[in-house]
């Protein structure tokens, strides 16, 4: 079992936010 460091949690959170942001922009572009 590997311990998750704070930096890994931060990177995962940022990447998730970027992915959701791009998904929303893509959805709006397709909707428009």
UniProtKB/Swiss-Prot annotation:
Key words of the record? Chloroplast, Membrane, Photosynthesis, Photosystem I, Plastid, Thylakoid, Transmembrane, Transmembrane helix
Please give the start and end residues of each transmembrane region: 9-31
Membrane topology field: Single-pass membrane protein
Name the InterPro entries for this protein.
PSI_PsaM, PSI_PsaM_sf
Major subcellular site? plastid
Locations listed in the record:
Plastid, Chloroplast thylakoid membrane
The Gene Ontology biological process terms listed for this entry are: photosynthesis
Family from the record: Belongs to the PsaM family.
Q: What is this protein called?
A: Photosystem I reaction center subunit XII
């Amino acid at each position: 079992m590997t311990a998750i460091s704070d930096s890994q949690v931060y990177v995962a959170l940022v990447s998730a936010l970027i992915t959701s942001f791009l998904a929303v922009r893509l959805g709006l572009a397709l909707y428009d």
